[in-house]
Amino acid sequence: MGTPAIRAACHGAHLALALLLLLSLSDPWLWATAPGTPPLFNVSLDAAPELRWLPMLQHYDPDFVRAAVAQVIGDRVPQWILEMIGEIVQKVESFLPQPFTSEIRGICDYLNLSLAEGVLVNLAYEASAFCTSIVAQDSQGRIYHGRNLDYPFGNALRKLTADVQFVKNGQIVFTATTFVGYVGLWTGQSPHKFTISGDERDKGWWWENMIAALSLGHSPISWLIRKTLTESEDFEAAVYTLAKTPLIADVYYIVGGTSPQEGVVITRDRGGPADIWPLDPLNGAWFRVETNYDHWEPVPKRDDRRTPAIKALNATGQAHLSLETLFQVLSVFPVYNNYTIYTTVMSAAEPDKYMTMIRNPS
């Protein structure tokens, strides 16, 4: 993350990399604490949008969730924005995208929150998630995808992190990792089709992004990931949707498929793609690493997670790539840091191996 704590921590990266090269691939790598598995819930897409999250919410203390919402909003939202958005939401509720707005209303009714608070906390995440995402191909042509999600408010959000299977007609449509009360997705998998993660591309203040969403009808970043997981039939369709749909903020979308060379980093402007960066394994580019900075630009020394990740992947080697070794790469400091909420590794060709670990658990 681009914070003073992480910037200072990055000075130890060279020592960490030296240790990395001394470790065997079978040994655990530089974990501060043992990670934990988040709870798994089913969300029925056959249920009414207002009701579909309630079975999951019943496993959580409403007071704790409300306190987390208040913390995020209080830290991220100026009071004048809160008052203005409260008025706007009431006027334009019918124009906000479905089923997301109805789902947020159902969550708010259960938690005794206003719709404005629910919309605000969902949009507040849109421009605050620092991350590392990797898509890679092994020597047999198998595609692997991993991500760390770094975010403030870790003490609360680690307790609200969950894996969710979205089910329709008794079948799993897609699997994702999210926070309780949050209807968008930053990490997800459509089985036997594709995987997606989103990384923040820091441009503009987030409340400007929110206003754009409400006034222009553009899609929030995380809502488009969920829409793509719901509707896209294959890797190519997913890439097209993620590249072309107007957004409320800039972002990096990382997509993995099921066939050789099906891996890409999409650098997004609000209006469309700024760059498409695919895997090119025939020319030695068997992985792509994205860490919140345009790949064609040097990363700032204060927040260089890219170089340690690349060195760890090269130390691993294409022939030894697997979900397990990719998890190890994502566990190397400062790729893994004090702000890391969770790590997910996934492969759409092997959907049952989707795995999330909560990091830095208290």
UniProtKB/Swiss-Prot annotation:
Gene Ontology CC annotations of this record: cytoplasm; lysosome; membrane
Catalytic activity: N-hexadecanoylethanolamine + H2O = ethanolamine + hexadecanoate; an N-(long-chain fatty acyl)ethanolamine + H2O = a long-chain fatty acid + ethanolamine; N-dodecanoylethanolamine + H2O = dodecanoate + ethanolamine; N-tetradecanoylethanolamine + H2O = tetradecanoate + ethanolamine
Summary of pH dependence: Optimum pH is 5 with N-palmitoylethanolamine as substrate.
Pathway: Lipid metabolism; fatty acid metabolism
UniProt-annotated catalytic positions: 131 (nucleophile)
Signal peptide span: 1-33
Activity modulation: Stimulated by DTT. Polysorbate 20 (Tween 20) is inhibitory. Stimulated by endogenous phospholipids such as choline- or ethanolamine-containing phospholipids, and dihydrolipoic acid.
Family in the record: Belongs to the acid ceramidase family.
Function: Degrades bioactive fatty acid amides to their corresponding acids, with the following preference: N-palmitoylethanolamine > N-myristoylethanolamine > N-stearoylethanolamine > N-oleoylethanolamine > N-linoleoylethanolamine > N-arachidonoylethanolamine.
Protein name: N-acylethanolamine-hydrolyzing acid amidase
Annotated gene: Naaa
